[in-house]
Protein backbone atom coordinates (compact mmCIF):
# COMPACT_ATOMS: atom_id res chain seq x y z
CA UNK A 1 0.00 0.00 0.00
CA UNK A 2 1.32 3.41 -0.86
CA UNK A 3 0.15 6.99 -0.73
CA UNK A 4 0.96 8.89 -3.88
CA UNK A 5 1.57 12.63 -3.72
CA UNK A 6 0.49 14.76 -6.64
CA UNK A 7 3.08 16.29 -8.93
CA UNK A 8 2.79 18.77 -11.76
CA UNK A 9 3.95 16.49 -14.56
CA UNK A 10 1.07 15.87 -17.00
CA UNK A 11 0.12 12.25 -17.51
CA UNK A 12 -0.21 10.52 -20.86
CA UNK A 13 -3.74 9.48 -21.80
CA UNK A 14 -4.03 7.45 -24.99
CA UNK A 15 -6.97 8.20 -27.30
CA UNK A 16 -8.46 4.78 -26.53
CA UNK A 17 -8.38 5.66 -22.81
CA UNK A 18 -9.80 9.17 -23.08
CA UNK A 19 -13.46 8.24 -22.57
CA UNK A 20 -12.59 6.28 -19.42
CA UNK A 21 -10.45 9.13 -18.11
CA UNK A 22 -13.20 11.67 -18.78
CA UNK A 23 -15.77 9.59 -16.91
CA UNK A 24 -13.52 9.11 -13.87
CA UNK A 25 -12.72 12.81 -13.62
CA UNK A 26 -16.37 13.79 -14.20
CA UNK A 27 -17.53 11.56 -11.34
CA UNK A 28 -14.64 12.84 -9.23
CA UNK A 29 -15.81 16.42 -9.67
CA UNK A 30 -19.32 15.40 -8.66
CA UNK A 31 -17.92 13.81 -5.50
CA UNK A 32 -16.13 17.05 -4.65
CA UNK A 33 -18.97 19.45 -5.34
CA UNK A 34 -22.32 17.71 -4.87
CA UNK A 35 -24.45 18.27 -1.77
CA UNK A 36 -25.77 14.74 -1.37
CA UNK A 37 -28.10 15.64 1.47
CA UNK A 38 -30.58 17.17 -0.98
CA UNK A 39 -31.44 13.76 -2.43
CA UNK A 40 -33.70 11.11 -0.85
CA UNK A 41 -31.40 8.38 -2.20
CA UNK A 42 -27.71 7.62 -1.87
CA UNK A 43 -25.62 8.70 -4.84
CA UNK A 44 -23.59 5.76 -6.11
CA UNK A 45 -20.15 7.11 -7.06
CA UNK A 46 -17.97 3.99 -6.78
CA UNK A 47 -16.24 3.12 -10.06
CA UNK A 48 -14.98 -0.30 -11.14
CA UNK A 49 -12.30 -0.42 -13.82
CA UNK A 50 -11.54 -3.70 -15.50
CA UNK A 51 -9.02 -4.52 -18.17
CA UNK A 52 -6.50 -7.25 -18.77
CA UNK A 53 -3.18 -7.20 -16.95
CA UNK A 54 -1.04 -4.31 -18.17
CA UNK A 55 -3.94 -2.26 -19.56
CA UNK A 56 -3.01 0.68 -17.34
CA UNK A 57 -5.84 0.64 -14.80
CA UNK A 58 -3.97 2.04 -11.80
CA UNK A 59 -2.01 4.38 -14.08
CA UNK A 60 -5.28 5.88 -15.33
CA UNK A 61 -6.68 6.35 -11.82
CA UNK A 62 -3.49 8.13 -10.71
CA UNK A 63 -3.71 10.36 -13.77
CA UNK A 64 -7.31 11.21 -12.88
CA UNK A 65 -6.33 12.04 -9.28
CA UNK A 66 -3.60 14.31 -10.60
CA UNK A 67 -6.05 16.04 -12.92
CA UNK A 68 -8.44 16.56 -10.00
CA UNK A 69 -5.62 17.86 -7.80
CA UNK A 70 -6.25 15.20 -5.16
CA UNK A 71 -4.02 12.86 -3.14
CA UNK A 72 -4.51 9.18 -3.82
CA UNK A 73 -4.23 6.21 -1.51
CA UNK A 74 -3.46 3.04 -3.46
CA UNK A 75 -4.39 -0.28 -1.87
CA UNK A 76 -3.76 -3.78 -3.16
CA UNK A 77 -5.81 -6.65 -1.83
CA UNK A 78 -2.71 -8.85 -1.99
CA UNK A 79 -1.04 -6.52 0.54
CA UNK A 80 -4.09 -5.89 2.72
CA UNK A 81 -3.46 -6.48 6.43
CA UNK A 82 -6.52 -7.51 8.41
CA UNK A 83 -7.68 -5.90 11.62
CA UNK A 84 -6.13 -7.73 14.55
CA UNK A 85 -2.85 -8.40 12.76
CA UNK A 86 -1.00 -5.61 14.60
CA UNK A 87 0.12 -8.03 17.30
CA UNK A 88 2.08 -9.96 14.69
CA UNK A 89 4.25 -7.01 13.76
CA UNK A 90 2.10 -5.74 10.90
CA UNK A 91 0.11 -2.54 10.57
CA UNK A 92 -3.51 -3.24 9.61
CA UNK A 93 -4.83 -1.50 6.53
CA UNK A 94 -7.90 0.16 8.01
CA UNK A 95 -6.00 2.42 10.48
CA UNK A 96 -3.97 3.68 7.51
CA UNK A 97 -7.18 4.38 5.64
CA UNK A 98 -8.39 6.30 8.69
CA UNK A 99 -5.20 8.39 8.67
CA UNK A 100 -5.72 9.19 4.99
CA UNK A 101 -9.34 10.19 5.56
CA UNK A 102 -8.42 12.50 8.42
CA UNK A 103 -5.78 14.13 6.27
CA UNK A 104 -8.36 14.66 3.51
CA UNK A 105 -10.67 16.36 6.02
CA UNK A 106 -8.58 19.49 5.52
CA UNK A 107 -8.38 19.09 1.74
CA UNK A 108 -10.95 19.33 -1.06
CA UNK A 109 -11.08 15.53 -1.12
CA UNK A 110 -9.14 12.43 -2.08
CA UNK A 111 -9.11 9.25 -4.14
CA UNK A 112 -8.84 5.70 -2.82
CA UNK A 113 -7.92 2.95 -5.28
CA UNK A 114 -8.56 -0.68 -4.33
CA UNK A 115 -6.57 -2.71 -6.84
CA UNK A 116 -6.70 -6.46 -7.53
CA UNK A 117 -10.35 -6.79 -6.51
CA UNK A 118 -10.55 -9.97 -8.56
CA UNK A 119 -8.24 -11.67 -6.05
CA UNK A 120 -10.78 -11.60 -3.22
CA UNK A 121 -13.52 -13.48 -5.05
CA UNK A 122 -12.58 -17.01 -4.01
CA UNK A 123 -13.94 -18.62 -0.86
CA UNK A 124 -10.96 -19.23 1.41
CA UNK A 125 -11.23 -18.25 5.06
CA UNK A 126 -8.59 -15.54 4.57
CA UNK A 127 -10.39 -13.88 1.67
CA UNK A 128 -13.69 -14.05 3.56
CA UNK A 129 -12.30 -11.69 6.21
CA UNK A 130 -10.45 -9.64 3.61
CA UNK A 131 -13.56 -9.33 1.49
CA UNK A 132 -15.53 -8.10 4.50
CA UNK A 133 -13.02 -5.32 5.21
CA UNK A 134 -12.67 -4.29 1.56
CA UNK A 135 -16.43 -4.26 1.09
CA UNK A 136 -16.77 -2.00 4.14
CA UNK A 137 -14.67 0.54 2.27
CA UNK A 138 -16.75 0.10 -0.88
CA UNK A 139 -19.87 0.54 1.26
CA UNK A 140 -18.34 3.79 2.58
CA UNK A 141 -18.35 2.51 6.14
CA UNK A 142 -15.47 2.93 8.60
CA UNK A 143 -15.32 -0.03 11.02
CA UNK A 144 -15.75 0.73 14.74
CA UNK A 145 -13.20 -0.07 17.44
CA UNK A 146 -10.11 0.82 15.42
CA UNK A 147 -6.66 1.22 16.93
CA UNK A 148 -3.86 3.32 15.47
CA UNK A 149 -0.37 2.22 14.42
CA UNK A 150 0.80 2.39 18.04
CA UNK A 151 -2.05 0.22 19.26
CA UNK A 152 -3.94 3.07 20.91
CA UNK A 153 -7.71 3.21 20.57
CA UNK A 154 -9.02 5.63 17.94
CA UNK A 155 -11.78 7.64 19.60
CA UNK A 156 -15.33 7.31 18.35
CA UNK A 157 -15.59 10.97 17.36
CA UNK A 158 -12.51 10.54 15.14
CA UNK A 159 -14.07 7.50 13.48
CA UNK A 160 -17.28 9.46 12.90
CA UNK A 161 -15.28 12.32 11.39
CA UNK A 162 -13.51 9.90 9.05
CA UNK A 163 -16.90 8.43 8.13
CA UNK A 164 -18.19 11.86 7.10
CA UNK A 165 -15.13 12.45 4.93
CA UNK A 166 -15.46 9.05 3.27
CA UNK A 167 -19.10 9.63 2.41
CA UNK A 168 -18.81 13.23 1.25
CA UNK A 169 -15.46 13.89 -0.45
CA UNK A 170 -13.70 10.62 -1.36
CA UNK A 171 -13.83 8.96 -4.78
CA UNK A 172 -13.47 5.19 -4.34
CA UNK A 173 -12.27 3.29 -7.41
CA UNK A 174 -11.97 -0.47 -7.65
CA UNK A 175 -9.80 -2.19 -10.24
CA UNK A 176 -9.25 -5.77 -11.29
CA UNK A 177 -8.28 -7.77 -14.33
CA UNK A 178 -10.91 -10.51 -13.94
CA UNK A 179 -8.70 -12.25 -16.46
CA UNK A 180 -11.28 -14.85 -17.49
CA UNK A 181 -13.15 -12.04 -19.24
CA UNK A 182 -10.20 -11.54 -21.56
CA UNK A 183 -8.73 -14.99 -22.07
CA UNK A 184 -11.33 -16.18 -24.57
CA UNK A 185 -11.03 -12.96 -26.52
CA UNK A 186 -7.38 -13.37 -27.44
CA UNK A 187 -7.42 -16.69 -29.23
CA UNK A 188 -5.84 -16.46 -32.69
CA UNK A 189 -8.27 -16.06 -35.57
CA UNK A 190 -7.82 -16.90 -39.23
CA UNK A 191 -7.47 -13.83 -41.40
CA UNK A 192 -5.21 -11.06 -42.59
CA UNK A 193 -5.92 -8.52 -39.86
CA UNK A 194 -3.41 -8.10 -37.07
CA UNK A 195 -4.34 -9.85 -33.85
CA UNK A 196 -3.92 -6.46 -32.17
CA UNK A 197 -6.99 -5.20 -33.98
CA UNK A 198 -9.20 -8.21 -33.24
CA UNK A 199 -9.17 -8.10 -29.43
CA UNK A 200 -12.72 -7.02 -28.62
CA UNK A 201 -13.62 -5.51 -25.27
CA UNK A 202 -16.49 -7.11 -23.33
CA UNK A 203 -19.82 -5.32 -23.35
CA UNK A 204 -21.99 -4.62 -20.32
CA UNK A 205 -23.87 -7.88 -20.76
CA UNK A 206 -20.61 -9.85 -20.64
CA UNK A 207 -19.59 -8.10 -17.43
CA UNK A 208 -22.90 -8.74 -15.73
CA UNK A 209 -22.65 -12.42 -16.60
CA UNK A 210 -19.07 -12.85 -15.40
CA UNK A 211 -18.46 -10.45 -12.50
CA UNK A 212 -19.41 -11.75 -9.04
CA UNK A 213 -22.78 -10.51 -7.83
CA UNK A 214 -21.33 -9.06 -4.63
CA UNK A 215 -18.90 -6.98 -6.71
CA UNK A 216 -21.69 -5.71 -8.94
CA UNK A 217 -23.72 -4.80 -5.85
CA UNK A 218 -21.01 -2.26 -4.90
CA UNK A 219 -20.69 -0.71 -8.36
CA UNK A 220 -23.92 -1.37 -10.24
CA UNK A 221 -23.51 -0.45 -13.89
CA UNK A 222 -20.78 2.09 -13.12
CA UNK A 223 -18.22 -0.09 -14.88
CA UNK A 224 -15.36 1.03 -17.10
CA UNK A 225 -13.59 -1.33 -19.48
CA UNK A 226 -10.07 -0.46 -20.61
CA UNK A 227 -9.10 -1.93 -23.98
CA UNK A 228 -5.83 -3.89 -24.09
CA UNK A 229 -2.62 -2.04 -24.93
CA UNK A 230 -1.06 -3.17 -28.19
CA UNK A 231 2.44 -2.66 -29.53
CA UNK A 232 1.52 0.54 -31.34
CA UNK A 233 0.30 2.04 -28.06
CA UNK A 234 3.67 1.32 -26.46
CA UNK A 235 5.51 3.13 -29.26
CA UNK A 236 3.13 6.08 -28.94
CA UNK A 237 3.80 6.32 -25.21
CA UNK A 238 7.54 6.05 -25.85
CA UNK A 239 7.45 9.09 -28.15
CA UNK A 240 5.51 11.17 -25.61
CA UNK A 241 7.74 10.25 -22.67
CA UNK A 242 10.86 10.78 -24.80
CA UNK A 243 9.80 14.36 -25.52
CA UNK A 244 9.86 15.01 -21.76
CA UNK A 245 13.34 13.53 -21.30
CA UNK A 246 16.44 15.72 -20.84
CA UNK A 247 18.39 16.07 -24.10
CA UNK A 248 21.23 13.86 -22.88
CA UNK A 249 18.94 10.95 -22.08
CA UNK A 250 16.41 11.24 -24.89
CA UNK A 251 18.26 9.28 -27.63
CA UNK A 252 19.22 6.56 -25.14
CA UNK A 253 15.63 6.28 -23.93
CA UNK A 254 14.30 5.98 -27.48
CA UNK A 255 16.91 3.44 -28.57
CA UNK A 256 16.46 1.15 -25.59
CA UNK A 257 12.69 1.53 -25.68
CA UNK A 258 12.43 0.54 -29.33
CA UNK A 259 14.53 -2.51 -28.65
CA UNK A 260 12.39 -3.67 -25.74
CA UNK A 261 8.86 -2.66 -26.65
CA UNK A 262 8.00 -5.82 -28.63
CA UNK A 263 8.74 -7.96 -25.57
CA UNK A 264 6.98 -5.51 -23.25
CA UNK A 265 3.83 -5.63 -25.36
CA UNK A 266 3.95 -9.41 -25.58
CA UNK A 267 4.36 -9.72 -21.80
CA UNK A 268 1.67 -7.05 -21.16
CA UNK A 269 3.90 -5.01 -18.86
CA UNK A 270 1.75 -1.89 -19.19
CA UNK A 271 2.78 1.72 -18.44
CA UNK A 272 5.11 0.63 -15.63
CA UNK A 273 7.40 -0.65 -18.37
CA UNK A 274 8.61 2.93 -18.90
CA UNK A 275 9.53 3.37 -15.26
CA UNK A 276 11.61 0.21 -15.51
CA UNK A 277 13.03 1.46 -18.81
CA UNK A 278 14.42 4.57 -17.13
CA UNK A 279 16.32 2.42 -14.64
CA UNK A 280 17.65 0.14 -17.38
CA UNK A 281 18.73 3.17 -19.41
CA UNK A 282 20.74 4.56 -16.48
CA UNK A 283 22.26 1.14 -15.76
CA UNK A 284 23.41 0.84 -19.38
CA UNK A 285 24.93 4.32 -19.27
CA UNK A 286 26.77 3.56 -16.02
CA UNK A 287 28.10 0.31 -17.45
CA UNK A 288 29.39 2.14 -20.52
CA UNK A 289 31.30 4.53 -18.26
CA UNK A 290 32.77 1.63 -16.28
CA UNK A 291 33.83 -0.17 -19.46
CA UNK A 292 35.38 3.02 -20.84
CA UNK A 293 37.62 3.46 -17.79
CA UNK A 294 38.56 -0.21 -17.86
CA UNK A 295 39.51 -0.10 -21.57
CA UNK A 296 41.48 3.10 -21.06
CA UNK A 297 43.51 1.44 -18.29
CA UNK A 298 44.12 -1.72 -20.31
CA UNK A 299 45.35 0.22 -23.36
CA UNK A 300 47.89 2.28 -21.43
CA UNK A 301 48.92 -0.70 -19.31
CA UNK A 302 50.13 -0.56 -15.73
CA UNK A 303 53.77 -0.47 -16.86
CA UNK A 304 53.17 2.64 -18.98
CA UNK A 305 50.82 4.44 -16.63
CA UNK A 306 52.13 7.48 -14.80
CA UNK A 307 50.25 7.93 -11.57
CA UNK A 308 50.41 11.07 -9.48
CA UNK A 309 50.15 10.00 -5.86
CA UNK A 310 48.29 13.23 -5.05
CA UNK A 311 45.55 12.54 -7.62
CA UNK A 312 42.70 10.09 -7.21
CA UNK A 313 41.77 7.78 -10.04
CA UNK A 314 38.63 5.70 -10.49
CA UNK A 315 38.67 2.54 -12.53
Predicted regions and their residues:
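Short glycine-rich substrate-engagement loop in P-loop NTPases that contacts/grips substrate
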Residues: 72-107
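Conserved nucleotide-binding/hydrolysis micro-motifs of P-loop NTPases
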Residues: 53-55, 67, 78-82, 117-120, ...
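Walker A/P-loop
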Residues: 44-75
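Conserved C-terminal "switch" segment of AAA+ ATPases
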Residues: 67-71, 106-107, 192-267
Amino acid sequence: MSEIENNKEPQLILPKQQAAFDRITAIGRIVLSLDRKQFPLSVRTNILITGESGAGKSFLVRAAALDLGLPILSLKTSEWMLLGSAGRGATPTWPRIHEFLMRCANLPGGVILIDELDKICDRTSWTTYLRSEAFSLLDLTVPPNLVDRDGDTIFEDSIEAAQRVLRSKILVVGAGAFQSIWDDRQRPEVGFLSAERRIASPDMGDLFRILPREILARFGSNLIVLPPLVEGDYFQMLDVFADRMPDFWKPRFIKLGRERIPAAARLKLGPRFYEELVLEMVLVERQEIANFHKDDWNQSGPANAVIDSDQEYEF
